[in-house]
From Swiss-Prot:
Belongs to the glycosyl hydrolase 38 family. Keywords: Glycoprotein, Glycosidase, Hydrolase, Membrane, Metal-binding, Signal, Transmembrane, Transmembrane helix, Zinc. It catalyses: Hydrolysis of terminal, non-reducing alpha-D-mannose residues in alpha-D-mannosides. It is a single-pass type I membrane protein. Glycans are attached at N175, N492, N496, N547, N551, N566, N613, N665, N768, N785, N952, N981, N1069, N1084. This is Alpha-mannosidase D.
């Protein structure tokens, strides 16, 4: 019996061993988690790993960097305030508490807008904890922008602004400088990103949303880490080390705290994930994101779950072939990655390598190299024809308002900065102006906020977009106020230090009086406004220094329409501000309102340039002609050609003459001419002759410079689809239809300055017109000196304005088709810094060939006999393509009642009206190399006009420029703004648009930058105005170009890397100290030469020289009659301006966004239920019908049979009753 039991035990034990072995081998059973690993097993594993490491090298062991983070959108499904109060404040408080309790824990934070708000809510104890966490390198800031910006629809100016706002706050508040970036949610990536970020001192970048097929390829060839070159012209200067996330920025599945896995399953799944991940990388340095959207709202729970499996892996690193695994900052990861690449010359440069070939040699040994990528990552696709190209255009009105508000912010920054500089010797004025600084910074924060990748893209819930629209309105009103007060402090001569220098500048002032139009030097010492509108010739530049009274009840205001009704005894000062660093001669337009049918008054309107007392030509066009539409009744457009000094101001008087015989020879009132067809007229100016089809759209253009005649087919179209959404443009199952093909009315206006053809569609009542198209060409009446020698910049394009509503389930385009143009499917789009090459792929549908456009799209002829370029400039971000040779297609509006289920979970129902303009140019390629960027900058930096009704005002400057001369033609003054402590920030951009008669190097040593503003501490900085740092590692990497990479276009159009940089010479007039980037300088006259490469943006900071010995003391007895009156301006503007503002001069309707309340859950159509219902319902219905027919048939047959039977019975009965008797 005992032997029998023993045998059974042996059998059971043997079977158990076999089963256990089977589980280990075939089911990957984790026996160590059941029994643990004893010392013998650990020694055995250690021995095995030592053998493996000896064979493969210790570098084969994995270094795992766990990156805790929370992706906090600045608006998406909730608005900014909602996210902060409901989630973000708890995330930050919880994370800080957890990090403070455990020094091993780390956290990475991106969105400084949220963090700064949270910081302001904390007490000093909590703030000190944060400082300690930063010092302990537990809390890290990555990217450091105010938000995480979009890369397709945000302009480079706005991207730089939002990054600068974050970087400046971090430096000022926490003395923190960001070194690595985390762009993990934008829907595709622009090549401008590595250029901009590297110029800010950022050394490495993490990206995520790369198209599925591209990312799969990158994994297969181990190119998830690569060097990204943003610009061919800048070379290594624009390069950055990039690491791509494996799948997404969320937790890997098995370690997600929200997933219900046991510890064993977590470890087993995660280690398998690590093994798979390592096969896609050249390095054994692995980065694992621990987070997702708005994670760590319960930081204690999230950290406790991860702490458990991290500890288990740390205790058994040898077994899992892990060198280290830990919570980490992004800085730690990149430092380890860089070290791994450079260690043992793995990716280091050798003496004999060629960095642009695929193979490198060092003697007989092959040296590996990192992939060098020189394109962008557009469009973004998630497969199944899901191309994220719709958001390039989604919410076109919002995109325009953001760009428009950004320009207003730029004007506000410039004028405030100059007002500070001009009043630097008056403490009272400085104190008054500085009360505006907080407003100014808050307005910048608003511009920064709307660059978020779900705001400027239009891909948030509608109520969220409405919240941002309201923020933009508020910032505009605030900027109106800042500009208004800055103008007072700039132009009121007794209010700045100009008068203190008058005696030293009489000679210059007299020269200016003798040559008003040609000399921009010393414009601050010009004449003052007088009550008669004439100019004083006083050498001191003041008509009456003892009577400098200012009517503060009438500030400089932004006006929608200047009301000239019953104002014959008054005149207006129109002050135009030029935000460009070049002198501007161009057409401008503004609205006026007069009494009904008062042609005599209209013909008596005069516009006089104040500085020269010279009446200039104007042309007046009515906005409506024959209706009773009250909203625009008696509204007119006034056109004029004005001259503006670089970065400066010029004043014009708008008045009505008193005399009955006051008809002005310089005022042309255009009478409307109703046409039956659009081809009854042509347009002509110095540059072009334009002919039209019968429907009023462009048909032919003649370039008078080259005598080239081209047939241009201009058309509107609409795609109909039910598969698109806020993000996705999907033409599958849809059709392309003609749109705006037959206008109901043609109205033609002509004159000396403008030819205009207006087409109206859907006209029942003029007020209810559905769509408007306005064709316009600008003409030069030779009022500007030297205008005969060169066309005005506004003459270089044909302008097409349109006003259309969003049609449901329609995506509207405008197309330009150049006949007989061979461009070999190649076209170019502007990314804000430079043009990028695109190739239309005919194997893909049109939506897969759309690309983002910030400034323009263009075609170039590739045939040998032609060298023409065709460019369409845009006024906002759009999507565009070239679907056939010679054709440019631009999407201008889209709306749908379906969602694409990419997270918004609500349809993008944008039925609102969008008023916009496009600008068509044709020219020689060489001419456009010089002009295209300048034209684009002029279009997006239109002069800003402010109005003052003046009566008994004296002592005002009439013309002003802070620059002694305009900047070289290829140097764009991108930014001038005041930072903290009155430090001034300056950015200069070499757009490489050089004069055809000059070389690429521009030398401006004959001038200084600023006219009389004395500056000190001139320092070159990074792009966000922090200390200039160079990435010393980037030029140590060996690189190669993978010609098999699946993205085949997106590279720079031109490379100017071998051309010399432009030279800008700064002088400090021999009075102050100018210090270069290395903090060298002398206290005497210093000349500073700045070299700016083509396509490079350089940044500087400096201080205005506050002359303390001349500062007026601030005391209570001083009567400050120039005190800022912010309340008045705000009240005026809020009530009469911003709420009833027109987008363009031709607009019939005020701006009216169509936002709606889409909070909560959207009831998604149940397509499966519909299919099942139809699948079951249709056969069932047919069956019921068949049954009914059969039953009916049988009933009828039975009834017929019964009737026949009854008839037979009756007949028999009758026969039986028949009398046969004779």
């Amino acid at each position: 019996m005992e032997s029998s039991k023993f045998v059974k035990i042996i059998w059971v034990f043997g079977i158990w061993i076999l089963v256990f072995t089977f589980l280990i081998i075939y089911n990957n059973y984790d026996y160590k988690s059941t029994f643990g690993i004893n010392k013998f097993e650990k020694r055995s594993l250690k021995t095995i790993n030592q053998i493996n490491n000896k064979e493969n090298g210790d570098d084969k062991k994995l270094s795992v960097f766990l990156i805790p983070h929370s992706h906090c959108d600045g608006g998406w499904l909730q608005d900014y305030d909602g996210y902060y109060y409901n989630i973000v404040q708890y995330i930050l408080s919880g994370v800080v508490n957890e990090l403070n309790l455990d020094k091993e824990k780390k956290f990475n934070w991106v969105e400084i807008g949220f963090f700064s708000r949270w910081w302001n809510d904390q007490n000093e104890i909590q703030k000190e904890i944060v400082r300690n966490l930063i010092n302990n390198k537990q809390l890290s800031f990555i990217s450091g922008g105010w938000v995480q910006n979009d890369e397709a629809t945000a302009t480079i100016d706005d991207v730089i602004t939002q990054m600068t706002q974050g970087h400046q706050w971090l430096k000022d508040t926490l003395n923190y400088t960001v070194e690595y970036a985390w762009q993990i949610d934008p829907f595709g990536y622009s090549s401008s990103t590595p250029t901009i970020f590297s110029s800010m001192g950022i050394k490495g970048l993490v990206i995520n949303r790369v198209s599925n097929d591209v990312k799969s390829y990158m994994k297969s060839v181990k190119e998830m880490e690569f060097i990204w070159k943003g610009s061919e012209s800048l070379g290594e200067q624009s390069q950055m080390l990039v690491s791509t996330l494996n799948i997404h920025y969320d937790y890997p599945k098995h370690i997600d705290p929200k997933k219900d896995f046991s510890l064993n399953d977590r470890i087993k799944g995660f280690t398998k994930y690590l093994n798979d991940l390592s096969k896609t990388r050249e390095s054994n340095i692995l980065m694992i994101p621990l987070g997702d959207d708005f994670r760590y709202s319960n930081a204690k729970t999230e950290f406790s779950v991860s702490k458990e499996w991290v500890k288990a892996l740390q205790d058994n690193k040898e077994y899992y072939n892990i060198k280290e695994i830990k919570y980490a900052t992004l800085d730690e990861y990149f430092i380890a990655l860089e070290d791994s690449f450079l260690r043992n010359n793995k990716f280091g440069k050798s003496r004999k390598q060629n960095v642009y070939t695929e193979t490198f040699s060092d003697g007989d040994d092959e040296v590996s190299a990192l992939s060098l990528y020189n394109k962008d990552f557009f469009p973004y696709s998630t497969g199944n024809l899901e191309y994220w190209t719709g958001y390039y255009t989604t919410r076109p009105l919002l995109k325009r308002l953001i760009r428009e508000s950004s320009l207003l912010q730029k004007s506000s920054d410039i004028l405030y900065t100059l007002a500070i500089g001009e009043n630097s010797n008056n403490q009272i004025d400085i104190n008054n102006l500085q009360t505006l600084s907080n407003q100014l910074n808050e307005n910048r924060n608003t511009i920064a906020l709307v660059q978020h990748h779900d705001i400027v893209t239009g891909t948030s819930r509608s109520f969220v977009l409405n919240d941002n629209f309201q923020r933009l309105q508020k910032s505009r009103i605030s900027n109106y106020n800042i500009i208004s007060n800055s103008l007072e402090y700039l132009l009121n001569k007794s209010n700045n230090k100009t008068n203190n220098n008058n005696n030293n500048n009489n000679k210059n002032n007299n020269n200016n009086n003798n040559n008003n139009n040609n000399n921009n030097n010393n414009l601050k010492n010009t004449n003052s406004i007088s009550t008669t509108g004439s100019s004083s010739s006083s050498g001191s530049g003041s008509s009456n220094n003892n009577n400098n009274t200012v009517n503060k009840s009438e500030p400089f205001n932004f006006e929608n329409a200047i009301d000239l009704s019953n104002e014959s005894n008054n005149q207006y000062s129109l002050v135009f501000h030029n935000t460009l660093g070049w002198e501007v001669n161009q057409h401008v337009s503004f609205r006026i309102k007069v009494n009904k049918n008062d042609n005599q008054l209209l013909e008596s309107i005069q516009l006089v340039e104040a500085i020269s007392n010279k009446t200039i030509q104007i042309q007046i066009i009515p906005i409506q002609d024959d209706s009773n539409c009250q909203s625009i009744e008696n509204n007119y457009i006034v056109f004029a050609i004005i001259n503006l000094p670089p970065l400066g101001l010029n004043t014009y008087y708008l008045s009505i003459a008193n005399s009955e015989d006051s008809k002005s020879n310089f005022t042309y009132l255009s009478k409307p001419k109703l046409l039956k067809k659009g081809n009854e007229i042509n347009f002509n100016n110095n540059r072009f002759k334009v002919e039209f089809e019968s429907n009023g759209l462009i048909s032919k253009i003649t370039d008078k410079n080259s005598n080239e005649i081209k047939t241009i087919e201009q058309t509107f179209h609409q795609y109909s689809t039910k598969k698109s959404g806020p993000y996705i443009f999907n033409v599958k199952g849809g059709k392309k239809h003609g749109f705006l093909e037959n206008p109901d009315k043609f109205i033609y206006h002509d004159g000396p300055l403008v030819s205009q053809l207006t087409m109206l569609y859907g006209v029942d009542d003029y007020c209810n017109v559905t769509s408007i198209v306005v064709q316009r060409i600008y003409k030069n009446n030779n009022e500007i000196n030297n205008s005969n020698s060169k066309s005005l910049i506004t003459e270089n394009y044909i302008e097409t304005g349109y006003s259309i509503n969003g049609d449901m389930n329609r995506e509207t385009t405008i197309n330009y088709k150049v006949k007989d143009l061979e461009n070999d499917d190649i076209f170019y789009t502007d990314n804000g810094l430079e043009s990028r090459k695109r190739i239309y792929n005919h194997d893909r549908s049109v939506n897969q060939n759309y690309y983002p456009v910030l400034g323009y799209i263009k075609l170039k002829e590739t045939s040998e006999n032609n060298n023409h370029q065709y460019t369409v400039y845009v006024d906002r971000s759009v999507g565009a393509t070239s679907p056939s040779d010679g054709e440019m297609e631009i999407m201008i509006h889209r709306t749908m009642d379906t969602d694409d289920w990419k997270g918004v979970n609500w349809p993008s129902k944008d039925i609102g009206r969008s008023d916009a303009k496009l600008y068509f140019n044709m020219d020689l390629v060489n001419n456009q190399l010089q002009n295209e960027k300048r034209i684009s900058l002029h279009i997006t930096n239109q002069p800003i006009m402010f109005v003052k009704k003046h009566n008994n005002q004296t002592g005002y400057l009439l013309k002003y420029s802070p620059l002694s001369n305009q900047l070289p033609s290829n140097i764009h003054l991108q930014s001038l703004l005041t930072l903290k402590n009155n430090t001034v920030g300056l950015r200069l951009f070499n757009i490489h648009e050089v004069d055809s008669n000059t070389q690429s190097t521009t030398d401006t040593d004959k001038s200084t930058l600023f006219n009389e503003l004395e500056i000190s501490n001139f320092i070159e900085t990074g792009l966000s105005f922090l200390k200039l740092t160079k990435n010393n590692l980037i030029d140590k990497f060996s690189t190669r170009i993978n010609k098999k990479f699946p993205i085949k276009c997106g590279e720079s159009e031109y490379s100017f890397i071998n051309e010399k940089p432009s030279s800008i010479i700064f002088s400090n007039n021999g009075t102050n100290n100018i210090i270069d980037g290395e903090n060298k300088g002398e206290n005497n006259k210093t000349i500073e030469t700045i070299q700016i490469k083509p396509h490079e943006i350089k940044s500087f900071t400096f201080n205005f020289n506050f002359q303390l010995d001349q500062i007026i003391p601030n005391n209570n007895n001083n009567n400050n009659k120039y005190a800022i009156n912010k309340e008045l301006n705000n009240e005026y503007i809020e009530q009469s301006i911003e709420n009833q503002r027109y987008e363009y001069d031709f607009s019939f309707f005020p701006i009216k966004p169509t936002f709606y309340d889409d909070r909560g859950k959207y009831n998604r159509p149940n397509h499966l239920a519909l299919i099942l219902s139809l699948s079951i319902g249709i056969p069932a219905g047919i069956l019921i019908i068949v049954i009914a027919l059969v039953v009916t048939y049988k009933k009828r047959k039975n009834r017929k049979t019964l009737t026949s039977s009854n008839s037979s019975s009756n007949l028999i009965q009758q026969e039986d009753q028949t009398d046969y008797s004779p």
